[in-house]
UniProtKB/Swiss-Prot annotation:
Catalytic activity: 5-amino-1-(5-phospho-beta-D-ribosyl)imidazole + S-adenosyl-L-methionine = 4-amino-2-methyl-5-(phosphooxymethyl)pyrimidine + CO + 5'-deoxyadenosine + formate + L-methionine + 3 H(+)
Protein name as it appears in the record: Phosphomethylpyrimidine synthase
Quaternary context: Homodimer.
HAMAP family: ThiC
Amino acid sequence: MSSRKQARLEAKNFIDSLSVQPYPNSKKAYIQGSREDIQVPVREISLADSLVGGTKKEPVFEPNVPIQVYDTSGVYTDPTHQIDLYSGLPKLREQWIDERGDTELLDDVSSVYTKERLEDETLDDLRYGNLPRIRRATDEQCVTQLHYARQGIITPEMEYIAIRENMGRQKFADEQLNHQHPGHNFGANLPKEITPEFVRKEVAEGRAIIPSNINHPESEPMIIGRNFLVKVNANIGNSSVSSSIEEEVEKLVWSTRWGGDTVMDLSTGRNIHETREWILRNSPVPIGTVPMYQALEKVNGVAEDLNWEVMRDTLIEQAEQGVDYFTIHAGLLLRYVPMTAKRVTGIVSRGGSIIAKWCLAHHQESFLYTHFREICEICAKYDVALSLGDGLRPGSIADANDEAQFSELRTLGELTKVAWEYDVQVIIEGPGHVPMHLIKENMDEQLEHCHEAPFYTLGPLTTDIAPGYDHITSGIGAAMIGWYGCAMLCYVTPKEHLGLPNKEDVKTGLITYKLAAHAADLAKGHPGAQIRDNALSKARFEFRWEDQFNLALDPETARSFHDETLPQESGKVAHFCSMCGPKFCSMKISQEVREYAKDTEQVAADQAIEIKMLDNPLEGMRQKSQEFRDTGSELYHPAVGAKEAQLEE
C-alpha cells in the first residue's frame, strides 16, 4: 500500500473511531454565565497535595487548588458528549442568532457553484450528509458583532468571551499563585478583569474582532485583539499532490486539541468545497480561508482568467457554508508590483502572486480592490470578518521592511476604514521574514496606519538559515511581535518551505506558538498570565512530577522525556531527575537549605558562634570545623521532620 493511501486509511480510522480524549488528570469544566445557555469551557487541571511537614507516619499535607486554563478543544475532550463527526457539533450559537430576529433561513443556496456541486451525484460519497439550512441577514440588516457593538448591544457572544478571557482566575486567593511581574505593554489597555462591556467597547472601536459567521453556529465565541490573550492560528488544507478530506478533518480535531484558537483551511487540491463543509460542521473554533485559492481552481489555475463574477460567487459560496473570516489581498496595487523587482525572493505570498500576475496581464487594479465595497456588503450579510492579506510580505530577511511591504500596509489601512463603513470586522495580516531588530517597526507602522485594527502575523521568521527548524526561527519573532501588540500569531511548522505538514508537524507548530503567545502575555503583563507558571514552578520545587507533566503545554512529551531515563513508578516521586541525580539536584539542596533555616535552635547556635568568631576568630572557626565533622560532614541537613518524610523515597 502506498504511503498516501495508508495515511488516508489511518485518517478514516481516526474519524470512525474518534472518542473523547481528555487531557491527563484534567476535566472539562464550565463557567456559568448570566443565562442558562452561556456555559464557558475551561480545562481544569487537578493537582496533588503538597507535603508541608509532619512525620513519616503522620505527614502533613496542604491541598493545591486546580488550575483552570483556556481550552479550544470543544466537546472533543468532554466525556459527557458522544462524538459523531458525521452529525457534526452542537449548534451552540443557533438560539442567540435566532433571537436577534435579523436573519432569515433560505430555501436554497445562492452560489451557482454550490448548486452544481449538490447536483453532482458522483460526489455523494464525499459529501457531508447533514447539511444545515443557510442563514442570511434580512433586507437592510447588518448582522456583524461590530454592528451590535456600535449599537451599544452586549451580545451573548461578548459575555461568553469575557468569561473565557478571565479563565476563572478571580477564585485564586493564593498569594504565591497570584504573584506576577509587572509587564511592559507598549500602550495596550489590560484591565485586571475583562467585562462584557470592555469586550463590546474594544469591538466597537475596531481594536478587536469576534469571528462568528451566522452559518457557523457550532463555533465557541473567541476574540482577537491586542488587549486580550494572544491567539494562535493553525493552517491545514490539502494540495493537488497530497492529503484527503479524512486527513484534513483529523488535522482540524488535532489542531483544536493542541490549542489552535482559529484554523485556516488553505486547501488547493480536489474537492475543496466538500472538504470545507466537513471541517466547518466539526469545528469548535472559527475557520478562515483564502477564497482566491478556490476561485483559481474554478478557472483551471489560470490567474489571468480570474474575474469578479467568479470571485463573488466563491465569496457567497464560502459565506453560506460558514467561513468566519476571509483573507483578501485587496491592498496589492498595480504600482506596487515593480517595487518587488529587486527583491531577493520577489513575491512569496500565493495570493499576492496571483493578484500581481492578474494586474500585469490586464494592466489595471485587481477586482478585489475595485470591488472592495461589494466584498464588504457580502461580509455584512453573514458576519464574515476580513483578514486583509499582505500579498507583498517579505519572503527573506533581505527583503524585510522594504518599500513594497509598507506601501501595501498603508493601503490596507485605507481599506480598513472602508470596511468599517459597512460594520465589517477587520484584522490586518503581517510578515513574514524579519530580523529581530526590525520587528518592532512593523508593529509601530501597523498601529499607526491601520488604526489599531488587530495585527495577525506569520511568525515573523528571524533568520533564513534553518529549513526544518522554522517553527523555532519564527517562534522567536512571534514571541517578540506578540509582546509588542500583535493579536494573533499564525503558526509555522517544521515543514515550512519544505512540504505539507502532517499531524505531528501541526502539533509541533502549535505547541511552539502557544509557547510564544504565552511568553508574550507574560511580557505584556496580561492579568493572571503567570498563574500557570507559578503552579508549575511550585510543583517542580516540590518534586510533584505528575503535576509538572499535566501543567505543561504538552504533557505527553514532558512525561515521555522524563520516563526515558526514569521509567519506574518510583521515578514519579523521586526528589531528583536524571539530569543531576540524587546528590546534585539544586531543587533538593534548596529544600534542605530551607528546612535547615527553619531550625531556630540551630539559628540561635549560629548566632552565638558568629559572636564568638568576632571576639576570637580562630576559636570560632575551630568550633565550626568541629561541628561540620560531628554532623557527618554533609553540606546540607534537612529538618528532622522533613528528612523522615522523605524516607519514603
